[in-house]
Amino acid sequence: DVPTFWSQAAQQGFKPKIVTIGKALLFPSVVDSLGARGNGLTSEIWWTPNHPFKSGLTGQSCQALADAYTKATKRPWTQPIGYQHALFEVAIDVLKHTKNPNDPKSVLAAITSTNYQSIVGPVNWTGKPVKNVSKTPLVAGQWQRKDGKFHLVIAENKTAPNIPVGGKLLPLS
Protein backbone atom coordinates (compact mmCIF):
# COMPACT_ATOMS: atom_id res chain seq x y z
CA ASP A 1 0.00 0.00 0.00
CA VAL A 2 1.06 3.60 -0.58
CA PRO A 3 1.66 4.67 3.04
CA THR A 4 4.00 1.70 3.59
CA PHE A 5 5.82 2.26 0.30
CA TRP A 6 6.22 5.99 0.91
CA SER A 7 7.49 5.44 4.44
CA GLN A 8 10.00 2.83 3.32
CA ALA A 9 11.10 5.04 0.42
CA ALA A 10 11.94 7.76 2.94
CA GLN A 11 13.83 5.28 5.11
CA GLN A 12 15.92 4.31 2.08
CA GLY A 13 16.66 7.96 1.24
CA PHE A 14 14.59 7.94 -1.97
CA LYS A 15 13.79 11.59 -2.73
CA PRO A 16 12.23 12.00 -6.18
CA LYS A 17 11.43 15.46 -7.55
CA ILE A 18 7.83 14.52 -8.24
CA VAL A 19 5.57 11.58 -7.38
CA THR A 20 2.16 10.95 -8.91
CA ILE A 21 -0.12 8.42 -7.25
CA GLY A 22 -3.59 7.63 -8.57
CA LYS A 23 -6.40 6.00 -6.63
CA ALA A 24 -4.57 5.80 -3.31
CA LEU A 25 -4.57 9.60 -2.94
CA LEU A 26 -8.29 10.16 -3.45
CA PHE A 27 -8.97 10.75 0.22
CA PRO A 28 -7.55 13.38 2.58
CA SER A 29 -7.27 10.76 5.33
CA VAL A 30 -4.69 8.82 3.31
CA VAL A 31 -2.63 11.95 2.70
CA ASP A 32 -2.95 12.87 6.39
CA SER A 33 -1.58 9.44 7.32
CA LEU A 34 1.60 10.27 5.41
CA GLY A 35 2.29 13.30 7.58
CA ALA A 36 4.72 15.86 6.17
CA ARG A 37 5.69 13.41 3.38
CA GLY A 38 2.21 13.82 1.91
CA ASN A 39 2.88 17.45 1.08
CA GLY A 40 3.50 17.84 -2.64
CA LEU A 41 2.28 14.45 -3.86
CA THR A 42 0.44 14.73 -7.16
CA SER A 43 -2.57 12.95 -8.57
CA GLU A 44 -5.02 13.16 -11.42
CA ILE A 45 -8.17 15.02 -10.48
CA TRP A 46 -11.56 13.99 -11.79
CA TRP A 47 -13.78 16.36 -9.83
CA THR A 48 -13.57 19.16 -7.26
CA PRO A 49 -15.88 21.85 -5.93
CA ASN A 50 -13.99 24.25 -8.22
CA HIS A 51 -15.03 22.52 -11.42
CA PRO A 52 -17.31 24.75 -13.55
CA PHE A 53 -20.12 22.25 -14.06
CA LYS A 54 -23.59 21.97 -12.58
CA SER A 55 -26.03 19.16 -12.14
CA GLY A 56 -28.52 18.82 -14.96
CA LEU A 57 -30.85 17.20 -12.43
CA THR A 58 -30.70 19.50 -9.40
CA GLY A 59 -29.03 22.60 -10.83
CA GLN A 60 -26.42 22.48 -8.05
CA SER A 61 -22.94 23.75 -8.77
CA CYS A 62 -19.98 21.56 -7.85
CA GLN A 63 -19.32 23.84 -4.88
CA ALA A 64 -22.94 23.58 -3.70
CA LEU A 65 -22.84 19.77 -3.92
CA ALA A 66 -19.57 19.59 -1.95
CA ASP A 67 -20.89 22.03 0.67
CA ALA A 68 -24.13 20.05 1.06
CA TYR A 69 -22.18 16.82 1.47
CA THR A 70 -19.86 18.33 4.07
CA LYS A 71 -22.77 19.86 5.98
CA ALA A 72 -24.76 16.61 6.00
CA THR A 73 -21.89 14.26 6.85
CA LYS A 74 -19.45 16.51 8.76
CA ARG A 75 -16.76 15.04 6.48
CA PRO A 76 -14.72 16.68 3.73
CA TRP A 77 -15.71 16.29 0.10
CA THR A 78 -13.87 13.71 -1.99
CA GLN A 79 -13.59 13.27 -5.75
CA PRO A 80 -15.96 10.29 -6.01
CA ILE A 81 -18.89 12.39 -4.72
CA GLY A 82 -19.28 14.15 -8.07
CA TYR A 83 -19.31 10.84 -9.91
CA GLN A 84 -21.77 9.23 -7.52
CA HIS A 85 -24.11 12.15 -8.13
CA ALA A 86 -23.56 12.01 -11.90
CA LEU A 87 -24.41 8.30 -11.92
CA PHE A 88 -27.92 9.09 -10.68
CA GLU A 89 -28.22 12.11 -12.98
CA VAL A 90 -27.44 10.04 -16.05
CA ALA A 91 -29.61 7.10 -14.95
CA ILE A 92 -32.60 9.40 -14.49
CA ASP A 93 -31.93 11.11 -17.82
CA VAL A 94 -31.78 7.73 -19.57
CA LEU A 95 -35.10 6.70 -18.01
CA LYS A 96 -36.67 9.99 -19.11
CA HIS A 97 -35.59 9.30 -22.70
CA THR A 98 -36.43 5.59 -22.77
CA LYS A 99 -39.52 4.88 -24.85
CA ASN A 100 -40.26 1.68 -22.93
CA PRO A 101 -38.36 1.15 -19.64
CA ASN A 102 -39.42 -2.53 -19.64
CA ASP A 103 -37.71 -3.18 -22.98
CA PRO A 104 -33.91 -3.68 -22.74
CA LYS A 105 -33.43 -2.57 -26.37
CA SER A 106 -35.28 0.66 -25.67
CA VAL A 107 -33.13 1.32 -22.59
CA LEU A 108 -29.98 0.55 -24.58
CA ALA A 109 -31.06 2.96 -27.32
CA ALA A 110 -31.57 5.69 -24.72
CA ILE A 111 -28.14 5.01 -23.20
CA THR A 112 -26.30 5.07 -26.53
CA SER A 113 -27.99 8.33 -27.51
CA THR A 114 -27.10 10.05 -24.22
CA ASN A 115 -25.53 13.48 -24.53
CA TYR A 116 -26.00 15.01 -21.08
CA GLN A 117 -24.45 17.90 -19.16
CA SER A 118 -23.74 16.61 -15.65
CA ILE A 119 -22.00 17.72 -12.47
CA VAL A 120 -18.80 16.05 -13.78
CA GLY A 121 -19.09 17.62 -17.23
CA PRO A 122 -20.49 16.27 -20.47
CA VAL A 123 -21.51 12.61 -20.59
CA ASN A 124 -21.79 11.66 -24.24
CA TRP A 125 -22.21 8.10 -25.47
CA THR A 126 -23.25 9.00 -29.02
CA GLY A 127 -20.14 7.44 -30.53
CA LYS A 128 -17.46 10.09 -30.26
CA PRO A 129 -14.59 9.79 -29.68
CA VAL A 130 -15.18 6.05 -29.18
CA LYS A 131 -18.47 4.16 -29.35
CA ASN A 132 -19.92 3.41 -25.87
CA VAL A 133 -17.24 5.47 -24.12
CA SER A 134 -17.69 8.87 -22.53
CA LYS A 135 -14.60 10.81 -21.53
CA THR A 136 -14.88 13.35 -18.75
CA PRO A 137 -12.24 16.02 -18.12
CA LEU A 138 -9.13 15.30 -16.07
CA VAL A 139 -6.71 17.82 -14.63
CA ALA A 140 -3.53 17.47 -12.61
CA GLY A 141 -3.46 18.26 -8.94
CA GLN A 142 -1.25 18.33 -5.93
CA TRP A 143 -1.84 17.87 -2.23
CA GLN A 144 -0.58 21.02 -0.54
CA ARG A 145 -0.57 21.71 3.18
CA LYS A 146 -2.08 25.04 4.20
CA ASP A 147 -3.17 26.08 7.68
CA GLY A 148 -2.24 22.63 8.99
CA LYS A 149 -4.53 20.78 6.56
CA PHE A 150 -4.01 19.17 3.19
CA HIS A 151 -5.87 20.67 0.25
CA LEU A 152 -6.11 19.21 -3.23
CA VAL A 153 -5.02 22.02 -5.55
CA ILE A 154 -5.52 21.97 -9.31
CA ALA A 155 -2.05 22.73 -10.67
CA GLU A 156 -2.44 22.01 -14.40
CA ASN A 157 -5.43 22.17 -16.72
CA LYS A 158 -3.98 21.87 -20.23
CA THR A 159 -6.39 19.06 -21.15
CA ALA A 160 -9.40 20.90 -19.68
CA PRO A 161 -8.75 24.67 -19.77
CA ASN A 162 -12.30 25.45 -18.61
CA ILE A 163 -11.42 24.02 -15.18
CA PRO A 164 -9.63 26.73 -13.18
CA VAL A 165 -6.11 26.26 -11.85
CA GLY A 166 -5.92 26.83 -8.09
CA GLY A 167 -2.17 27.11 -7.63
CA LYS A 168 1.27 26.25 -8.91
CA LEU A 169 2.94 22.87 -8.80
CA LEU A 170 5.34 22.93 -5.86
CA PRO A 171 8.38 20.73 -5.31
CA LEU A 172 8.05 17.81 -2.92
CA SER A 173 8.94 18.83 0.60
Model feature map: region roles:
Residues 45-46, 88-89, 117:
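Short acidic (Asp/Glu) and glycine-rich catalytic loops that position anionic groups and cofactors
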Residues 16-20, 102-105, 118-120:
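Acidic/polar loop patches that form or flank catalytic/metal-binding clefts of enzymes
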Residues 27-34, 110, 125-129:
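Intrinsically disordered, low-complexity boundary segments flanking structured domains
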Residues 1-49:
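Extracellular/periplasmic bilobed ligand-binding domains
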Residues 1-9, 50-113:
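Extracellular/periplasmic ligand-binding modules, especially the Venus flytrap/periplasmic-binding
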Residues 33-35, 56-61, 139:
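Short, surface-exposed amphipathic charged segments that create phosphate/polyanion-binding patches used
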Residues 48-52, 161-162:
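A short acidic, often aromatic-flanked loop/helix-cap motif at beta-alpha or helix-coil junctions
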Residues 112-173:
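Solvent-exposed, acidic/polar segments of extracytosolic/periplasmic ligand-binding ectodomains
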